[in-house]
From Swiss-Prot:
Pathway entry: Nucleotide-sugar biosynthesis; UDP-N-acetyl-alpha-D-glucosamine biosynthesis; N-acetyl-alpha-D-glucosamine 1-phosphate from alpha-D-glucosamine 6-phosphate (route II): step 2/2; Nucleotide-sugar biosynthesis; UDP-N-acetyl-alpha-D-glucosamine biosynthesis; UDP-N-acetyl-alpha-D-glucosamine from N-acetyl-alpha-D-glucosamine 1-phosphate: step 1/1; Bacterial outer membrane biogenesis; LPS lipid A biosynthesis
Keyword list, A-Z: Acyltransferase, Cell shape, Cell wall biogenesis/degradation, Cytoplasm, Magnesium, Metal-binding, Multifunctional enzyme, Nucleotidyltransferase, Peptidoglycan synthesis, Repeat, Transferase
Gene this protein is translated from: glmU
Cellular component terms (Gene Ontology): cytoplasm; membrane
Taxonomy of the source species: Bacteria, Pseudomonadati, Campylobacterota, Epsilonproteobacteria, Campylobacterales
Organism: Helicobacter pylori (strain J99 / ATCC 700824) (Campylobacter pylori J99)
Protein name from the UniProt record: Bifunctional protein GlmU
Amino acid sequence: MLSVIILAAGKGTRMHSSLPKTLHTICGEPMLFYILEVAFSISNDVHLVLHHQQERIKEAVSKRFKGVIFHAQIVEKYSGTGGAIMQENKTPIPTQHERVLILNADMPLITKDALTPLLESHNNAIGLLHLADPKGYGRVILENHQVKKIVEEKDANDEEKTIKSVNAGVYFFERKFLERYLPKLHDQNAQKEYYLTDLIALGIKGNEKIDAIFLEEECFLGVNSQTERAKAEEIMLERLRKNAMDLGVVMQLPSSIYLEKGVSFKGECVLEQGVRLIGNCLIENARIKAYSVIEESQIINSSVGPFAHARPKSVICDSHVGNFVETKNAKLQGTKAGHLSYLGDCEIGKNTNVGAGVITCNYDGKKKHQTIIGENVFIGSDSQLVAPINIGSNVLIGSGTTITKDIPSGSLSLSRTPQTNIENGYFKFFKKP
């Protein structure tokens, strides 16, 4: 077994946000959560080092993950990546296992498989990337697959600048290596910080073997700005789309479809152009038509859209929800709502037809109220159902009706005033003085 230490103490100033960098989302999930999931898939001893807004991050993590061991970096004494794994007197964070994997919290694209080459090393090891354009990165000089030295770009000579091998920021150490060399680490540099790369240099000086393990560039993309966050999200979207299509989901123009990590599919599903699936959604044997938005909802044996919006807690089964229909906290069973309706805080029974422009008036300015509609109900266009209201089964509601009282089963309900036609009324109205 191994222990994992995740470094999440940085301010993330380049994000230009009051939200801690590691809580910025990638496909609906805080980026830190992705790496915590990977950590727990390979270890039962996971440590998280915090500083900036640590209570906010700790609260978010604790709601989702159990067993994370939190540490506060002592930045006043030990700043930098090397300082992050230091306790008082420069001793390393105590871990349960002899092998220690060190990861950065801003790498949400890391997978268990991507880490495998590093974890198979029997020596201390550092993860490397081979970059076509390594400009801006320190170079890693190799000799017989071992790290010889790490040179910062500003200190590299012309020959060293041609090297494409750079530090991925991922390390796999023996605990005794940390115990031996961490106390020797110093902050005698321009930034007055302790660096993990200097730890590598100390090990090389002490004749330690440091394996160089090349890793997949895409999986170790660091997120330090909103531009990099967007790039990481696009890569994650490609993974989620591929996973869905591998399950048999049909996607029309996949690049236009947005879905989040919590979305699940069952049966035969079709997603048309511009669909957005947000939060924990279940799409089962359903067709989501163009430019529809589904949030925290279940769509089962139904068609939705185009241009429909299922807001949170909508459960749409065996139904058709058409153009510009919005639902929220709505349970539809065998219902047809073809166009231009708002159905909120309601339950609608089988074989019910909702005409165009029908609104469930669920909010009275203070509280939300529920509308219950039975089976075999026909609701005429442009009707308003003022909640709380209970409509029985086998009910016919005339077009343009405002319902304010319960309707018993078998009833016809109308509330329109009689139509009056005034002869020559047009000419009288527009008569010039």
